């Protein structure tokens, strides 16, 4: 449980670093 939330958080973090 919570894998979806963690995945979304990682996606947002990656987008932040790439931006």
Swiss-Prot record:
Supply the alphabetized keyword list.
Answer: Antibiotic, Antimicrobial, Secreted
Q: What phylogenetic lineage does the species belong to?
A: Eukaryota, Metazoa, Ecdysozoa, Arthropoda, Chelicerata
The entry's function note states: May inhibit growth of bacteria.
Q: Where in the cell does this protein reside?
A: Secreted
Name this polypeptide is given: U1-lycotoxin-Ls1a
GO CC list: extracellular region
Q: Which domain of life is it from?
A: Eukaryota
Chief localisation class: secreted
Q: Does the keyword ATP-binding apply?
A: no
Its GO biological process terms?
defense response to bacterium
In which tissues or organs does this protein occur? Expressed by the venom gland.
